[in-house]
């Protein structure tokens, strides 16, 4: 059982730092970026890079070509038809893809995902690193209870 989590077209370096620290705390096997738009100056006072690797992919095709064998790409997007996280059954082998702070995941990325899930909220949407934390916490709770 393993999972990775990352952000497509991330533009805010702080969100990557928060994702990295949360990923370590929730047991992610790796994190990644797809077409990142920030300057690569990661500051990590907790040295998460020593325990959770970061992969950088040029674009969604590059990520898809490098998905581990028998692993599903799960998009996280508040869009019509997306499965509600509250009833979602996490897969044993999954890579979660979240979208940029300003636009969400691209249409091309959404079309390449095996599934799309959404986090219900009262209004608008969550910050991308907060959404990642919610997904990882939900995964930890549901899979540890099996």
Residue map of PLM features:
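RNA substrate-binding interface of SAM-dependent RNA methyltransferases
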Residues: 1-79, 140-141
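Residues that form or flank phosphate/diphosphate-binding pockets in enzymes
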Residues: 14-15, 83, 104, 126-127
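Short, glycine/charged-enriched secondary-structure capping and boundary segments
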Residues: 19-21, 46-48, 87-91, 110-113, ...
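Short, acidic/turn-prone active-site loops that include or flank metal/cofactor-
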Residues: 36-37, 59-60, 101-103, 121-125
